[in-house]
Amino acid sequence: IAQSLNRRFGTSFHAGNILMTVGAASGLNVILKTLLNPGEQVITFAPYFVEYGSYVRNYDGELVVVSPNTVDFQPNLVEFEEKINEKTKAIIINTPNNPTGVIYSEETLQKIAAILEKKQKEFGTSIVLLSDEPYRELAYGGVEVPFVTKYYHNAVVGYSYSKSLSVPGERIGYVVIPDEVDDSAALIGAATIANRVIGCVNAPSLVQKVIKYCIEHEVTVDLETYEKNRNLIYGALTEYGFTCAKPDGAFYLFVKSPVENEKEFCEVAKKHHVLVVPGSSFACPGYVRLAYCVSYEQIERSLPAFKKIAEEYGLCK
């Protein structure tokens, strides 16, 4: 894994920087268990994966949420800087993002890094940037996903093969703790112990062998299938009058609800046998998330229902 990352991103990782985990969820819990003291804070950007709050509370921490920037769903950096204080221990970012599919730009990561460097000096603390990257390989149209350790020395990466290999049930991933991270040797040692004490013990050894094979033979999901699905559903929904940002990655579409209460819209959609998740589940009310990680034919069959819903709300004639 270290060699593969070095080839792809020009890094200089070694085996000691990699800790195999039981998926990305386990990896995040391992790092938070390692970092957090009771009452310390972790900041994340809305919209965000709802389980982050539970992960932080597992270790008596507090999740602080930055309001969404609904213009382009890049992070709201003005509010972000305001929310950092002496209790801030870590920042969680997720790019490509669930639920928007947006990829944080290189400029965004550079600005986040500059803010964190400034705040570390201001408070005399160490703030870890924890990048949750289960969708890293799912980027479309030649868009690159910037690798966060290039921009900030105190960055830790969590990865899962659930999406890149379509094996979510196998629970296999890793965390990268670079040598450049503050007290990296202590952090790596503590994370190794945390992997055991939270009950994961170690990542499944048989699946680790499968991962080695997949890396050596460049096995991954068929991106063309996802991109084809994205183009179909995005094109149809925008044609019907819905508003949504075209995702550069992942396999979600984050759609603006035609009514203020998006849960009401979810119930209407359900009557047409369309299931969508309310944006309030991601701390971004007024939107809904749908997933296009299904067959192309299933999306085609759903389009008449989406059109009827649009007609009900007067979005199209």
Question: What kind of region is each of these model predictions?
Answer:
Residues 6-317:
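PLP-dependent class I/II
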Residues 2:
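Class I S-adenosyl-L-methionine
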